[in-house]
């Protein structure tokens, strides 16, 4: 499922799950890095035992960032990766284990998604380069200077972040150096274990981590109260965290900041898009919006799985169940239901969209059907398909209604967009992409002079950053239609545009009148209504149209529909086992591009999936041949590249130069379905046998399935044991003693590629911060997880001895009078210190902040006399020297002052009851607040009025404090 969509839904519905991460500064005021002492207590008031890094979520933003200039070379990339790990480490400060997992060869089900992503990336890059070249040629034809083309080798192909490429091999070497450097030079690394699972170890990074956690949990030496922290941004990490059933599991990730500014692809400057680019011209005089935005380190946040469990336990609780309620089983069912909405291995059902509340709909249906099912949907990662069929039948009965409601919502949205655009054009805000901004009613429009090439253009008198960007963007697009001879004139007009003071000439007024007579929305400016919808799920016959368009069969082919539904259910069984037991089959995949309908699951209770056939993962180079487009062939051996481009290649059909993207009811191409041919595994592997003999020794090494490695420092209590294993130079696996390794179980063996302790370690990274180690103080050996029988089932339950974390949410039976005022928990620890002011601090605040805030807009009735306090009042002012000058600030005003001048002249009371009662008129101390309805002013009782808080009467003594709270009568007073 989409990461932003799911995370936005989750944090909106369960807000207490997220807390901001506290961290010590790693840079001083001059931007220089300063070391952080990670041996000190954790700044988040929560100590963590194990830190797991899903490394691909770190590698991608460090190698091709979207919010800053890209690194110049690989060495800078590696240095940024090290810096990123250091920052995460300094926030979490693990006390036992650091686990780094890089994506290895994935199961076939995941490879299909990887193939789609990489082919899309190649297609988008080609289209982007064509657009850049087209814009470059257009500017050069106008005689405008353009930046030189980037060198071919300067382009970083992000597809190289795939197992088996030379880049990933060099990255693994760099990470080994990084670990040795830290255990040698950083005291906080001295007593922990570090496990590195590089790209030669099969499996996705997050699932290699989950395999490790599952196998450690099955060992008696495991501490059931281990505090885990997993770093990664994928949405499925949340489900994986719940699936562990660990008592203390947390996720750390970057805070998602939408709408980040991006540099122009041609000139590298900010503030405009490629189509608006004017080449290498100096744009710094266009304001701050066109300069490079301030580079700010992104904040990190924690998502606390124990708090999410609290929410879900409340939500999934059901009264009068015909069986005993088990919260662990209910949580597993919740994870399973989320798979229907989206996952990396199956397309989501057409009737389920997360933005339409699909998960809530499924949970509601689940709670209704559980009384008929008389049991849970899943157990230990294996679904009960007869109960799944009941849920799907229930969803199928309302599919028609869901599709109709979706269409109604879309029509309503389009109508609102048209109305919004009309309003924006009416008030001169422009109509481009919803970026314009209407002006207030009391503000008259201003127009720039009509000389030169710029047409009259509405401009807000008070320029905001958004309006300035909009005006400058429109001016640029106008200027692009003219030749270089008009550049100076365009610049002068643009400068006049930005410096406009608001004067209008008679010609401007006439122009404005002519424009007012024109239609609000011109036909050529109407919003793109999106692709034509031929399926029309909201009309009768939708199922037949869907199957004919997507599968080229009619809906009357019942057998085919059931076959697709059975394949989908087989996929659900595979995904659930993948999350709870590990990979059930390396070669299974869903063989269709589209999902069936919920109403087609009518016979899935009869289906029995079979994953008993032994399978094995692809080799790294074989995976590259499965997921790479021909445009990324440079990462493959030379002879293997030819199979992707030569016309006589037996597998040339697997690498189409172009392919169709079915928008499938969506608006943007990235949301559509890439109709790529599925890889024929048998034909691919047979063809590759002819080029295997051409591999060099280095290429053969990259093509092997490798082991995990474990590192410790010289001061670790297991150092001598590790050294004995290393000096034996034996390939035999030796069991670990968990008591000497913080509870870690498994086996180790000699690593022939490791640098022995005491020897120099030459840095593979040519960077100032990556110096050679004169004396290596770390040791590395091969590591293997604990082994279990082939048919072993890992139980999905809370371990004995696990202590429940302290509850974060307010108890349902909390009584403020009986139990005291409830204090919400902020962060991990309810007893964490909170910021507060002493008496001197409060005095200083009252000294400098003496005026009240402005009141909100008041109630406006239909009659003329009821327009009381429509506008927000200004902040009041108290003259401490002369209490007679105790002004209420600006009164609410609104469209017209209240007609009763007698009440208005009661000096100072505007900030009190009058401002509060009529909503406006800030002043006195607290301000009028947002008055919501007319309320007569009571001079004798001096009440604050209805609103956000009535300010004090004008004659009160300092310090002034507003009285009335929102929505009730509050007596103003001072203390």
Swiss-Prot record:
Nuclease as UniProt keyword: yes
Ranges annotated as biased composition (Basic and acidic residues): 804-821
Name of the featured protein: 5'-3' exoribonuclease 2 homolog
GO cellular component entries: nucleolus; nucleus
Disordered, as annotated region: 424-443, 505-532, 804-975
Role according to the record: Possesses 5'->3' exoribonuclease activity. Plays a role in maintenance of steady-state concentration and turnover of microRNAs (miRNA) by degradation of mature miRNA. Degradation role is enhanced when in complex with paxt-1. Partially redundant to xrn-1 in miRNA guide strand degradation. Implicated in differential regulation of mRNAs such as let-7 by controlling the accumulation of mature miRNA. Positively regulates molting of the pharyngeal cuticle.
Induction: Up-regulated prior to molting.
GO biological process, one term: nuclear-transcribed mRNA catabolic process
Major site of localization recorded for this protein: nucleus
Zinc finger residue extent: CCHC-type: 262-279
EC annotation from Swiss-Prot or TrEMBL: 3.1.13.-
The gene coding this protein: xrn-2
Disruption phenotype: RNAi-mediated knockdown results in impaired miRNA degradation leading to accumulation of mature miRNA passenger (miR*) strands. Defective molting owing to failure to shed cuticle from the pharynx in the late L4-stage larvae. Suppresses the vulval bursting phenotype of let-7 mutant. Reduced paxt-1 expression.
Amino acid composition bias (Gly residues), ranges on this chain: 850-860, 886-895, 908-932
Location within or outside the cell: Nucleus
Keywords assigned: Developmental protein, Exonuclease, Hydrolase, Metal-binding, mRNA processing, Nuclease, Nucleus, Transcription, Transcription regulation, Transcription termination, Zinc, Zinc-finger
Region (Interaction with paxt-1): 534-787
């Amino acid at each position: 499922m989409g990461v932003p969509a799911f995370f936005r839904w989750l944090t909106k519905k369960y807000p207490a799950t997220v807390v901001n991460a506290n961290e010590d500064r790693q840079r001083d005021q001059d931007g220089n890095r300063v070391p952080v002492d990670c041996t000190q207590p954790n700044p988040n008031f929560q100590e963590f035992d194990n830190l797991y890094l899903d490394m691909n979520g770190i590698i991608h933003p460090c190698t091709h960032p979207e919010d800053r200039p890209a690194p110049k070379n690989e060495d800078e990339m590696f240095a940024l990766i090290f810096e990123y790990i250091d920052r995460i480490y300094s926030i979490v400060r693990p006390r036992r284990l650091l686990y780094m997992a890089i994506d290895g060869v994935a199961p076939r089900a995941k490879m299909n998604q990887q193939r789609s992503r990489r082919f899309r990336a190649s297609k988008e890059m080609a289209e982007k380069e064509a657009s850049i070249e087209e814009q470059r040629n257009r500017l050069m034809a106008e005689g405008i200077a353009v930046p030189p083309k980037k060198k071919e080798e300067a382009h970083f192909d992000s597809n190289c972040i795939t197992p088996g490429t030379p880049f990933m091999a060099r990255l693994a070497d760099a990470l080994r150096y990084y670990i040795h450097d830290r255990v040698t030079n950083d005291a906080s690394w001295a007593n922990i274990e570090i496990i590195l699972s590089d790209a030669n170890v099969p499996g996705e990074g997050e699932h290699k981590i989950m395999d490790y956690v599952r196998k450690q949990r099955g060992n008696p030496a495991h501490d059931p109260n281990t505090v885990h922290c997993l770093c990664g941004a994928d949405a499925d990490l949340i489900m994986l965290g719940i699936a562990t059933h660990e008592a203390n599991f947390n996720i750390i990730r970057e805070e998602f900041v939408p709408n980040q500014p991006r540099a122009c692809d041609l000139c590298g400057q900010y503030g405009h898009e490629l189509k608006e680019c004017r080449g290498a011209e100096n744009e710094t005089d266009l304001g701050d919006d066109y300069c490079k935005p301030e580079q700010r380190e992104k904040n990190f946040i924690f998502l606390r799985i124990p708090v999410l469990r609290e929410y879900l336990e409340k939500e999934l609780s059901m009264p009068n169940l015909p069986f005993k309620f088990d919260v662990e089983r209910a949580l597993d069912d919740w994870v399973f239901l989320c798979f229907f909405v989206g996952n990396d291995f199956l397309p989501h059902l057409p009737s389920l969209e997360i933005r339409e509340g699909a998960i809530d709909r499924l949970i509601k249906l689940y709670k209704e059907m559980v009384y008929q099912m008389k049991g849970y949907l899943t157990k230990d990662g294996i679904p009960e398909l007869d109960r799944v069929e009941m849920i799907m039948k229930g969803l199928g009965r309302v599919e028609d209604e869901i599709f109709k409601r979706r269409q109604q919502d879309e029509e309503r949205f389009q109508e609102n967009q048209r109305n919004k655009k009309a309003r924006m054009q009416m008030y001169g805000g422009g109509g481009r992409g919803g970026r314009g901004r209407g002006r207030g009613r009391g503000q008259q429009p201003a127009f720039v002079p009509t000389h030169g090439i710029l047409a009259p253009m509405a401009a807000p008198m008070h320029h905001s950053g958004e309006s300035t960007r909009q005006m400058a963007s429109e001016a640029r697009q106008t200027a692009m239609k003219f030749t270089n001879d008009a550049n100076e004139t365009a610049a002068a007009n643009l400068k006049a545009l930005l410096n406009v003071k608001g004067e209008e000439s008679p010609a401007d007024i006439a122009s404005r009148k002519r424009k007012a007579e024109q239609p609000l929305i011109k036909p050529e400016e109407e919003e793109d209504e999106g692709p034509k919808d031929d399926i029309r799920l909201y009309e009768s016959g939708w199922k037949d149209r869907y199957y004919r368009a997507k599968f080229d069969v009619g809906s009357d082919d019942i057998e085919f529909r059931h076959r697709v539904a059975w394949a989908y259910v087989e996929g659900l069984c595979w995904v659930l086992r993948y999350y709870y037991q590990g990979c059930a089959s390396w070669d299974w995949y869903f063989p269709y591009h589209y999902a069936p309908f919920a109403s087609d699951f009518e016979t899935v209770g009869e289906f029995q999936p079979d994953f008993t056939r032994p399978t094995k993962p692809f080799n790294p180079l074989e995976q590259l041949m499965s997921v790479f487009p021909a445009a990324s062939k440079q990462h493959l051996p030379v002879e293997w590249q030819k199979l992707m481009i030569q016309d006589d290649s037996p597998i040339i059909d697997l690498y189409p130069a172009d392919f169709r993207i079915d928008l499938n009811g969506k608006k943007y191409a990235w949301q559509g379905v890439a109709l790529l041919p599925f890889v024929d595994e048998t034909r691919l592997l047979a063809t590759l046998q002819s080029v295997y003999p051409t591999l060099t020794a280095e290429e053969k090494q990259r093509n092997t399935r490798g082991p995990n490695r474990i590192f410790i420092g010289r001061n670790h209590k297991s150092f001598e044991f590790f050294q004995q294993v290393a000096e034996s130079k034996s390939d035999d696996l030796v069991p670990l003693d968990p008591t000497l390794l913080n509870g870690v179980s498994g086996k180790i063996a000699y690593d022939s590629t490791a640098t022995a302790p005491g020897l120099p370690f030459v840095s593979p990274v040519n960077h100032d911060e990556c110096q050679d180690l004169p004396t290596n103080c770390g040791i590395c050996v091969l590591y293997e997880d604990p082994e279990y029988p082939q048919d072993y089932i890992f139980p999905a339950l809370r371990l004995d001895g696990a202590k429940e974390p302290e509850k974060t949410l307010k108890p349902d039976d909390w009584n403020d009078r009986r139990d005291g005022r409830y204090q919400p928990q902020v962060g991990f620890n309810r007893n964490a210190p909170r910021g507060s002011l002493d008496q001197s601090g409060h005095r200083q605040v009252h000294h400098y902040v003496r005026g009240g805030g402005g009141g909100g807009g008041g109630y406006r009735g239909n009659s003329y006399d009821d327009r009381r306090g429509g506008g927000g009042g200004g902040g009041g002012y108290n003259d401490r020297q002369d209490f007679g000058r105790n002004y209420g600030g600006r009164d609410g005003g609104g469209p017209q002052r209240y007609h009763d001048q007698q009440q208005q002249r009661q000096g100072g009371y505007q900030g009190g009851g009058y401002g509060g009662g009529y909503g406006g008129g800030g002043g006195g101390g607290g301000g009028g607040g947002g008055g919501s309805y007319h309320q007569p002013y009571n001079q004798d009782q001096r009440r604050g009025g209805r609103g956000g808080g009535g300010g004090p009467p004008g004659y009160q003594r300092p310090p002034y404090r507003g009285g009335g709270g929102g929505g009730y009568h509050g007596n103003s007073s001072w203390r």
